[in-house]
A protein has these predicted regions:
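Anionic-ligand binding patches
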Residues: 2-5, 11-28, 32-33, 37-220
Length: 220
């Protein structure tokens, strides 16, 4: 039974979200109760906002009202310090075509070709939102999460998606590294999925959203 719709057609994002929410919400079977927008023909919502939060809410609202289901959405991206926050909300289409990870990585690495390690600071950002349709009470919530890191000079690893192969999390490196430095010098595409999902920007945003989602499901 569909209880929650993820306002996205990105299968990588759906897999990641299911793992983030697994066993965190009473009465929710993430494998059967959480589906993506494409599986129930929900609309593909243009990202016309100018912030992650605006885009996230646009998608959640549209899907909630069109399907009558509780909808969750996120807008995520990479913010590079030396590029003054770019690619930001344009991360998924940085190279011109939405969702072309290889082209986006190639373009960004080219733009940073001459930037030394000490100036390659960046962070993953995520605004996660919940929209409950009018028939079920009609309310919204937005939460935010970040993962700071350093950008590598070349992709590393086959896991994850998006900019994961070039992002090395700060928290897994240095003198105070989590997990005793076992994952130092690894990109988000190399570290185990369960480790990534414990520190990622998306995990932090959606975990903050969990109480609102639990409340919505209890009153459904």
């Amino acid at each position: 039974m569909v209880k929650v719709v993820l306002a996205s057609r990105n299968q990588g994002k759906l897999r990641e979200l299911r793992e983030i929410l697994r066993n965190r919400i009473f009465g929710l079977n993430v494998d059967t109760d959480v589906v993506d927008a494409a599986s129930i023909n929900a609309p593909d919502v243009p990202e016309t906002g100018v912030t992650f939060a605006e885009n996230s809410l646009l998608k959640a609202r549209a899907v909630a009202e069109s399907t009558g289901c509780i909808a969750i959405a996120d807008d995520s991206g990479l913010s590079v310090e030396v590029l003054h926050g770019a690619p930001g909300i344009f991360s998924a289409r940085w190279a011109g075509e939405h969702g072309d990870d290889t082209a986006n990585l190639t373009l960004l690495l080219g733009q940073l070709r001459d930037i030394s390690d000490e100036h390659r600071a960046a962070k993953f950002c995520c605004a996660a939102s919940l929209a409950v349709p009018s028939a079920l009470g009609g309310y919204e919530a937005v939460e935010y999460g970040e993962l700071p890191g350093t950008l590598l000079h070349a992709p590393q690893g086959d896991g994850g998606f998006g900019y994961d192969p070039i992002m090395m999390p700060v928290e897994l490196n240095g003198d105070n590294a989590l997990y005793d430095g076992a994952y130092a010098d690894q990109s988000c595409a190399q570290i185990p999925t369960e480790i990534k999902n414990s520190i990622s920007h998306r995990a932090r945003a959606f975990e903050a959203l969990v109480p609102y989602l639990q409340q919505a499901l209890e009153h459904k």
